Amino acid sequence: MSDFAFFALEALIKCIIIIAIFASLAGLATYAERKVLAYFQRRIGPDMVGPFGLIQLVADMIKLFTKEDIIPSNSQKFIFAIAPLISAICAFVSLAAIPMLPEFTLFGRVIQPIVADINVALLFVIGTSGLCFYAVFLGGLASNNKWSILGAARGLVAIISYESVGALALIAIVMLVGSFSLVDINNYQSDGFFSWLIFKQPLAFVLFIIALFIETNRTPLCLTENDAEIVAGYGTEYSGLRWGMFFIGEYASMIAGAILVTLLFLGGFNSFWIIPGWIMMIVKSSFIFFWYFWARAAFPQLRPDQVMKMCYLILIPLAVLNLLITALAVLL
């Protein structure tokens, strides 16, 4: 087999594995979230279908995929139909440039656990994951429903504002490392616990986490949907499989965000003491992923004006200040 054929086959297998694993993890994450929220609220959560309620995932999937797929008669039907697909595709494409685990050897060949090791991987991931929200915006706009349009518009204002916060936080990381490659950023933190970038850029870490909550539409910073204000927001008119694709795209983006935080700030997949790197990657990413659930259970939903004031009056000035301090540190 030629090198090109092997490369193409390897990339195809990696893509299939990523889609299969992360689609499954997205479903498992819904079960985990329901259990965590139940614990916070002194409830039991899913426990009737299968051991510990685990088969509830299958029951929910069957219910979701067999529901009637309704397209409103007054909607922009083509855009309404493809928006969920765009959301899911963008979420999975962003995973292509994220190194998941340390490299390993298989049948005498070194395998990189990444589909595309590009030198601007950070830009690629931020760009493609950001497109997920524009699919949400298109879906809300095409629904021709006042709640959907209002949710999409609120979310668009927030994402444009908070992407600036996230970008400024990441520029500080790039200035320190000198590369947009996620592999290079991971290797920069390979000298032990105190080489993790969270110790050099604690403010950038906090800013990026906040921006990530906006990017993934998570409470307490979710403006696209709110039962008390705009019903289900952009998803008000969606049902069945199309709603499920938005759902899968959202949770895949959450998983990608947790992995990205681990790579950027928490030492990535470098080994720690006697703990292998792949175990460290899973543990740290799971810990960050848990924050989504904890924040939803612990904090109330903020009003849109509070979210925007926090962005422009607090977070952007802090991000600019952090960038200036980092620039001075690099120059000196």
From Swiss-Prot:
It catalyses: a quinone + NADH + 5 H(+)(in) = a quinol + NAD(+) + 4 H(+)(out). GO terms for molecular function: NADH dehydrogenase activity; oxidoreductase activity, acting on NAD(P)H, quinone or similar compound as acceptor; quinone binding. Its EC number is 7.1.1.-. Pfam families: NADHdh. GO terms for cellular component: plasma membrane. It is found in: Cell inner membrane. Belongs to the complex I subunit 1 family. This is NADH-quinone oxidoreductase subunit H. It comes from Campylobacter jejuni subsp. jejuni serotype O:6 (strain 81116 / NCTC 11828).
